[in-house]
Amino acid sequence: MTILNIAAVDLGASSGRVMLASYSTENHKISLEEIHRFKNQFVSQNGHECWDLAYLENEIVNGLRKISNSGRTLHSIGIDTWGVDYVLLDQNGEVVGPTYAYRDHRTDGVMQKVQAELGKEVIYRKTGIQFLTFNTLYQLKAMTDENPAWLSQVKDFVMIPDYLNYRLTGVINREYTNATTTQLVNVNIDSWDTALLDYLGLPASWFGRIRHPGHQVGLWENRVPVMSVASHDTASAVISAPLSDENAAYLCSGTWSLMGLDTTTPCTDECAMNANITNEGGIDGHYRVLKNIMGLWLFNRLCTERDVTDIPALVKQAEAELPFQSLINPNAECFLNPSSMVEAIQQYCREHNQVIPKTTAQLARCIFDSLAMLYRKVALELAGLQGKPISALHIVGGGSQNAFLNQLCADLCGIDVFAGPVEASVLGNVGCQLMALDQIHNAAEFRQLVVKNFPLKQFKKRPHFMPASDFEEKWCEFCALN
């Protein structure tokens, strides 16, 4: 029996891991082992929020060396990260300028300026990407306006996972799923939109050819293949979401919550634009028609501010609080990166004549209720786009462990919710590597392996969780916030 040892590097906005997947080519068992975990956080450079690339590279290599030093033969490596953030390289492959983080405030007001100059509908028809203030399009516009002197130094533009692959292999590869998060890829041709690049005043030569995942980029230390995976972590997570049928939706639940459909065609009509739906690239010729929701970022910040160490206990305390006393719009800009999340929530409730949550449990309940309400709203929008009701919701990622929020989601959306796998991005990363290693052929085949190896938990709508008239009142209150 042959065991393939596959390293999946999974970087998030607050932490990173090097995971080792062991895959049996005989019985198709997959096991996961965390080899190395490290913190990730913004670093301040000249008043801007940035990423420390040298630190990330060093931690990744530390994790890979731990595997090598354990005596196990490593068969391949893949890296996935968040989207939208990029690196500029000069002709020697050295980094030009800081590597800004998407929560940096330099893009404040830039999106509105670009929309006014180009036209919102024009941008959306070209790219199919939802309008978020930190999309790469607006980051680059801020850069060209503020630091035009850098332009003459730059030879290559790469996304962060492509940069890390380059550091491991010396080879530049521009991976499709992450490239689509930039709002610079034309959804009709799956290539860079030259008109948008011209608008920014940037040469097409910076950007190079986009390639789909599932192939070898190069070798680490001249011996271990580094594979191009679905390097946007959400794209990897969707690969491992064991969708029950074509009308099932997924919810990648973590720092961000991303709810969507796995489709063969993008949706860029006026209804999709008005709903701020995004059409990000997937694999096997599919698109991720989805919506970004601020997600557990709000809860994580609450726990940090209130020094919460026992998160399961706080979730239970929140469950015991009265429901729907305070509702917020989790996607409101004031929650993107406030100096105090507690104060931001309380101020929002004050401005919208809501009950002001004070205790940590009340604040947590406010967050969970509001997220579940927003999940319901997005599910209804997605159903409207596809012309069919959502049949089931598959919640994957770390947030799928929150049974209370899963149950709220089933109650409010009125459909069965299936939770798991927890390590969705890691598994999707592994799945792409297995495709590159010719062990499996497509996402559908890999999802069957996921179900066999990682049991799901099912949540059904409770028939009498709240009187219909009371809920309708709260639902109307929430919709008025959006």
Curated annotation (Swiss-Prot):
One GO term of the biological process aspect: glycerol metabolic process
Protein's UniProt keywords contain Repeat: no
Coiled coil: none
Pathway(s) it belongs to: Carbohydrate degradation; L-rhamnose degradation; glycerone phosphate from L-rhamnose: step 2/3
Active site: 233 (proton acceptor)
Enzyme Commission number, as recorded: 2.7.1.5
Keyword Nucleotide-binding (UniProt): yes
Pfam family, one: FGGY_N
InterPro entries associated with the record: ATPase_NBD, FGGY_N, Rhamnulokinase
Record-linked CDD domains: ASKHA_NBD_FGGY_RhaB-like (cd07771)
Known catalytic reactions: L-rhamnulose + ATP = L-rhamnulose 1-phosphate + ADP + H(+)
Residue sites binding ATP per the record: 13-17, 255, 300, 398
Cofactor: Mg(2+)
Binding site for substrate: 83, 232-234, 292
Gene Ontology CC annotations of this record: cytosol
A single GO molecular function term of this UniProt record: ATP binding
Cysteines paired by S-S bonds: 349-366, 409-413
Keywords for the protein's UniProt record, in alphabetical order: ATP-binding, Disulfide bond, Kinase, Nucleotide-binding, Rhamnose metabolism, Transferase
Family under the similarity heading: Belongs to the rhamnulokinase family.
HAMAP family referenced in this protein's UniProt entry, alphabetically: Rhamnulokinase
Function according to Swiss-Prot or TrEMBL: Involved in the catabolism of L-rhamnose (6-deoxy-L-mannose). Catalyzes the transfer of the gamma-phosphate group from ATP to the 1-hydroxyl group of L-rhamnulose to yield L-rhamnulose 1-phosphate.
The protein's name: Rhamnulokinase
Native species: Mannheimia succiniciproducens (strain KCTC 0769BP / MBEL55E)
Gene: rhaB
